[in-house]
Amino acid sequence: MERGQRKVRIGTVVSNKMQKTIVVAVEDKFRHPLYGKIVKRTKKYKVHDENNICNVGDVVKIMETRPLSKEKRWRLVEVIKKAE
């Protein structure tokens, strides 16, 4: 039996004040079904960062994983762009 593909998101680090955990904001754009306007929606994910390598402002790729704590279900895959 095949396991489904894990979800992958790209977002910006907004907090790194916890140990081995970062908060990543992922922006989603979609067209409103009735009015047709492009709407921006932001969702924040708590992400496991094993080596504490991320800083606020970094652009990162995250992947879905097994539950690591009450709210952590994502892990860091790579840092795409470091903050200046």
Swiss-Prot record:
Listed CDD domains: Ribosomal_uS17 (cd00364)
GO CC aspect terms: cytosolic small ribosomal subunit
UniProt KW keywords: Ribonucleoprotein, Ribosomal protein, RNA-binding, rRNA-binding
A biological process from GO: translation
InterPro entries linked: NA-bd_OB-fold, Ribosomal_uS17, Ribosomal_uS17_bact/chlr, Ribosomal_uS17_CS
A Pfam family the protein falls into: Ribosomal_S17
Transmembrane feature ranges: none
Domain of life of the native organism: Bacteria
GO molecular function, one term: structural constituent of ribosome
Job description of the protein: One of the primary rRNA binding proteins, it binds specifically to the 5'-end of 16S ribosomal RNA.
Subunit relationships: Part of the 30S ribosomal subunit.
Protein family according to the UniProt entry: Belongs to the universal ribosomal protein uS17 family.
Name listed for the protein in its UniProt record: Small ribosomal subunit protein uS17
Organism (species): Caldanaerobacter subterraneus subsp. tengcongensis (strain DSM 15242 / JCM 11007 / NBRC 100824 / MB4) (Thermoanaerobacter tengcongensis)
Lineage summary: Bacteria, Bacillati, Bacillota, Clostridia, Thermoanaerobacterales
Gene of this entry: rpsQ
